[in-house]
Amino acid sequence: MAIRFQYNKTSLQQQEKALKMRVRTLPTIKAKESALRQQVKHTKMEVERLEARLEEELRGYQGMVRLWGEFDPSLITVQSVELSMKKIAGVMLPVLGDIHYEIRPFSIFNAPSWWAEGIELLKTLATVGIEAEFQRLKMEFLDHARRKTTQKVNL
């Protein structure tokens, strides 16, 4: 798409008006880009922290691997994940709310005694995993918005 110049007073006034608008809005767009860059950096650090925590939790329970063979994984399921929307640096982003789990009743007399602790462990692991995935998705949204804003600055 080539820019066509017209050498008349009206088109010159239109170009000057567009230039003034771009010059006036450039500091705002640069500030938005900077805020988005900071948010991306912060979110990336949060994702790394959550992934490290998840790996640490999994490593801590490696000794119980043989016991998990008798555990019924259908005892606990994620029922719902609450989301809300929040505007951060001019971008609408989802915010993670509560995570609701459905725990199927089981007999504490017939089941092994560690199943209650196993359910809590699975809740913890699922919560950390969902939070990490959610933060990763949030980081992708922010990075996309940052790239678009950078394109506007570079115009």
Give the residues covered by each predicted segment:
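Charge-rich amphipathic alpha-helical interaction elements
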Residues: M1-L155
